[in-house]
Amino acid sequence: MSLHGIHTIDTAFQRDHFDAAYLIVEDGRGAFVDCGTNHSVPLLLAAVQQAGITSADIDLLIVTHVHLDHAGGAGLLMQQLPNATLVAHPRAAPHLIDPEKLIAGATAVYGEEEMQRSYGTLLPVPEARVRVVEDGETVMLAGRALECIDTPGHARHHHCIWDARSRSWFTGDTF
């Protein structure tokens, strides 16, 4: 079920109904907002199929921020989305292109075993497939405007997404 072409996907991070990603479908084209962890990727791909489109129809993966419960699966998911561009905050993009600091930091906090259990192996996203967006910049999905607004409260690399068509905010971890 969707409203305004927005499908909510439970990423199954840690427990049910704790973390979500979104699939926006407009005129047969798709965009994800956030992606969860590597373990979430099969759920996201199933949502694409349930929405009646294919992974080749996904044009955008927009991450609100690089914390691993929201963007840890970006590298793996992008491998499955041949036509997608990853959209990221200027402070987030370098960590998605080269996740070594994310890996080191999370491993230091959680340990190797928990890191693997919760997030899996983080993969880089090729720089050529990453689009950095500044505050107020708009990305388009089949004519649907998605505006990226810098919201550094939760993390300095966080932005929220305003979808004018549905009059909805995608807030990541910002209230």
Feature locations, PLM:
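Core dinuclear metal-dependent hydrolase active-site scaffold
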Residues: 23-25, 136-163
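Conserved beta-strand hairpin/beta-sheet module of binuclear metal-dependent hydrolase folds
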Residues: 1-51, 55, 161-171
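A short, structured active-site edge motif that brings together acidic residues
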Residues: 87-95, 99
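Short, glycine/acidic-enriched loop or turn micro-motifs at the edges of active sites
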Residues: 13, 37, 68, 153, ...
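Short alpha-helical
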Residues: 39, 68-69, 94, 101
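Active-site metal-binding motif and surrounding structural segment of the metallo-beta-lactamase
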Residues: 42-88
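Metallo-beta-lactamase
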Residues: 96-149
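Active-site neighborhood of phospho(di)ester-bond hydrolases with catalytic His/Asp-centered motifs
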Residues: 33-36, 58-65, 87-89, 151-153, ...
